[in-house]
């Protein structure tokens, strides 16, 4: 599977260190669960969203508490409790100011995973389905790829505005 675990961790680590709730909310609005290949990262992302929606601060302590409340803490590996995992996320970004760049890397890998998924599905449909089914799957996959490319283009525009 195509993934960017270091960029995922760096992005989440930046959000754990962002002091302005509006900044965190803005970045959370730009990502989807499917952008993250690591289910632990998805759990942290979900905890962050829950906290922001409740008007609570997002930091390692509040996120760990939310993971516990939601019962997701068990998702963390046996040798790495949620607190240790979150500490690793805090240490992941070389520069908190590069959060937008980490997000771009995550989104680029999302597009690549979408292409990979579509390619596998189209291969399967080509080998074993009717042409009508193949056309439907092709259209659906094309629409999803266009959506993902659109998200990437929107982020590229935002990135250009942030660097100026």
Where do the language-model regions lie?
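Surface-exposed polar/charged interaction patches
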Residues: 92, 125-128, 155
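Short amphipathic alpha-helical coiled-coil/interface segments
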Residues: 138-149
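A charged, amphipathic interaction segment
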Residues: 99-136
